[in-house]
A protein has these predicted regions:
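Solvent-exposed strand-to-loop "edge" motifs in beta-rich extracellular domains
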Residues: 81-87, 110-112, 192
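Bacterial N-terminal signal peptides
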Residues: 7-18
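Extracellular/lumenal carbohydrate-interaction signature centered on repeated Trp-anchored short motifs
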Residues: 68-78, 178-181, 203-204
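Extracellular/luminal beta-rich ligand-recognition
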Residues: 107-165
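Extracellular carbohydrate-recognition regions
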Residues: 19-42, 118-128
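Beta-strand acidic-aromatic groove motif in beta-rich domains, primarily in extracellular
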Residues: 88-109, 115-118
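Extracellular beta-strand ligand-recognition surfaces/modules
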Residues: 100-105, 161-171, 176, 181-221
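Short carbohydrate-recognition loop motifs
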Residues: 45-66
Length: 236
């Protein structure tokens, strides 16, 4: 996986985030619900399709790409359910190269992490000036089905920095690659608590965007997965 953490709104920020991305062909039924597809340069795009239950099905074989849609408001709790019927073997998501995964559900935020330095902020400001009125996410949390599950060893909060977008994206493995397949799994995450844990700041910025991605370019594995009913919910 080369460029997880880049979102559709950050296409112009691609050099900053670790690679070039470009708009892809979005299926009309997904586009009608606000999704936009994008592809990574040099990687064959995966297939995203709408399911009868208004979810998203992802199919890939040695491919990778993502879809994104706006999601605005305070960082509350995010819930969804997903399943993987076929996916890649366990890979180390904490290192560059070979870091494949079946699905990642990522959320973009309006604010920088405390660790974002002058260079990163300056590059972002230049990209924002070129992007126009649509705000570009400045940080992201990515929840992954894949990996070994040991990438965040020693971290009590379970997050680790993306090897491709340090300072912008922190990842957390919710389901490792060897998790049971062929069955639905319900998820609920507290975005506010997770942002504080991952980035070390008490002030949590608003959320801006939702991204679903897949990448099996390195292992050339096959993916057949679904995610549905993604929604903001009250935190219990």
């Amino acid at each position: 996986m080369r460029r997880l953490g880049a979102s559709l709104a950050v296409l112009i920020l691609a050099p900053l985030l670790g690679g070039a991305a470009a708009p892809g062909m979005t299926p009309p039924d997904l586009e009608a619900e606000g999704w936009r597809k994008a592809t990574w340069s040099g990687i064959r795009p995966a297939e995203f399709s709408r399911t009868a239950s208004r979810g998203v099905r992802i199919r890939a074989e040695g491919q990778g790409s993502f879809i994104a849609r706006p999601l605005s408001g305070p960082a509350g709790c995010l819930a969804w359910r997903w399943r993987v019927d076929a996916g890649p073997p366990a890979t180390d998501l904490g290192r560059r190269g070979g870091d494949d995964r079946a699905i990642a559900v990522s959320v973009g935020f309006a604010g920088f992490s405390p660790s974002a330095g002058f260079v990163l902020r300056t590059q972002h400001a230049m990209a924002q000036a070129s992007a126009g009125e649509r705000p570009l996410p400045r940080s992201a949390l990515s929840y992954v089905w894949g990996g070994t599950g040991r990438e965040a060893a020693g971290q009590a909060h379970g997050f680790f920095q993306s090897p491709w977008t340090p300072g912008i994206t922190n990842l957390r493995v919710l389901r490792p690659a060897d998790a049971p397949r062929g069955q639905w799994v319900e998820e609920r995450v507290d975005l506010s608590a997770d942002w504080r844990a991952a980035f070390g700041s008490a002030e949590v910025p608003p959320i801006t965007e939702l991204v679903i991605s897949v990448d099996v370019e390195d292992t050339n594995a096959r993916v057949d997965a679904q995610v549905e009913n993604i929604r903001l919910v009250p935190c219990r």
